[in-house]
Amino acid sequence: LEGNTYSRLDTRALIEHGQAAQGKAASETQMILNHKSAIELLVENVQSAGNLDGQGGAAVAGLDRYTLMNLHAALSENLLPNPADEGRVRQHTVEIGHSVFRPLSLPQQIGDALDTLLAKARQIADPFEQAFFMLVHVPYLQPFADINQRTSRLAANVPLFRANLCPLTFVDV
């Protein structure tokens, strides 16, 4: 995870045994626990494309605003300066360091662009192409106050999970 100094061994101890690493910031521990929670959310709510009957009223994660907002909320819990920004479209201007690119700044425009992005993603038949589309376009849009890249990396797994394919794994990102 970007900005996190936990080793793989420390991460494993935290996830499997709840042991926070000594000398690490609480925000780093929270980041890992949030990631675990978001992955669990995906696994619990994604059904393969061949089993979409939704028996038992179970939610089915898809390339939709509901899934994206829930992923962001899980990933950003207790990490953003304003807790109201967790799991909602950005309400303020952001700047990207060392870049002249300026993302959309009006919440209505951001929401409309996000809906368009998700509609385009759903029109893509190939799950690998859908995954790549989400991976690239969510961070470019910057729909959230922060944690856009982490959200896109997990959202990219939705079409893969639904097609019963292995999720993306990033090492040293």
Predicted regions and their residues:
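FIC/Doc superfamily catalytic core
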Residues: 1-173
